[in-house]
Amino acid sequence: RPAWLSFTLEILQTVILALLLYFMIDSVLARVRVENVSMQPTLQSGNFILVNKLAYKLGEPHYGDVIIFHPPDGSVEDYIKRVIGLPGDHVEIRDGKVFINGNELYEPYIAAPPRYNYSGDVPEGHLFVLGDNRNRSSDSHEWGFVPLESVIGKALVVYWPLEEIKNLVAPTIVRAANGP
């Protein structure tokens, strides 16, 4: 076999392998750019994050998960918010505090306490979500619950800009809503 043919085949194999890896990774992970202030201080406008698109195909959402979803109002851009209430939960917001099933949530990540009140029960197959910038976020307190089938995935990490790299999967973010 001529050297040029071996070299060409090796390059072709490398390109095919790179494309296969790209499509495999792309089917599992999404790259999302944050475009607004609704998740400040956790996320800043201009942050780039990686999203696990298989997270809720293989498991269930948890309190405190930061998720990407298609908005219920049908707008073009996807939303990013934090899961506050799960199916069957009673959510109440009063006096600047959030309560799930009567238990106050510990929320060290919010920009400021909410200046609004809310009360409702999360229906089966839905989530109650809020932005961390409670008073500058369009979220479940305004337009209701997010159907689970609208969820694209779970935010994993901020990867850009480099000085703001951080893990978004933090198990202690929200105290359990079923008790202390």
Where are the regions that the model predicts?
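Protein maturation boundaries and topogenic segments
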Residues: 1-78, 148-150, 154-180
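Short, surface-exposed secondary-structure edge patches
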Residues: 38-42, 57-60, 82, 88, ...
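Mid-length scaffold segments of soluble, non-membrane domains
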Residues: 78-103
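PP2C/PPM family metal-dependent serine/threonine protein phosphatase catalytic domain
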Residues: 100-115
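Solvent-exposed soluble domains appended to multi-pass membrane proteins
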Residues: 119-124, 144, 149-150, 179-180
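Phosphate/adenylate-binding glycine loop and adjacent helical scaffold
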Residues: 131
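Active-site loop architecture of trypsin-fold serine endopeptidases
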Residues: 135-144
